[in-house]
Amino acid sequence: MLDALADHDVSGEQLRIADFDVKPGVEKDMGDGDEWPGIRAKILAADILVLATPTWMGHMSSIAQRVLERLDAELSETDDAGRPILAGKVAVAVVLGNEDGAHAITADLFQGLGDVGYSTPSQGGLYWNGEAMHTVDYNDLPETPEKVAQTTATLARNTAHLAKLLRAQPYPAP
């Protein structure tokens, strides 16, 4: 996804939340070694959030759920004009797995991300589902399936477009 966004002059950084000690909770800093504050700073600095998750038993991972929970702290945060602090930023969902659930996961992610202020572009979700009960992972595929490549290109184009529009013309202040 980051490579596809780069085609639209969008640069980014990949953070694998599983590699960090992100404490459970709904505060900006849960203390005691919580690494969320550093991640939060990067999220706030970014115009685009790509939230990717595997499908586990038909649901998003507990780590993706934790990201949503930690973003809950932003509900009461506003900018100088009184807008939600994440309003004007764009979020997209990427879901991979060997079982059903991609549409439901995308819907859950979009609801949570929208609640904290993110906007989602047209066709803002990307997913790949392998065969149920098989062991082939997306990373094991010899090449990216054509439909996934097409959807990735569309998602990147629409995401970059919306982010540029919102940066140039923010949502009105209350």
Model-found features: residue ranges?
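Short, glycine-/small-residue-rich phosphate/pyrophosphate-handling segment
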Residues: 80-131, 147-150
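N-terminal beta1-alpha1-beta2 submodule of the flavodoxin-like/Rossmannoid cofactor-binding fold
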Residues: 1-81, 139-174
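A short acidic, often aromatic-flanked loop/helix-cap motif at beta-alpha or helix-coil junctions
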Residues: 20-23, 128-135
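Short, local alpha-helical segments
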Residues: 90-94, 136-142
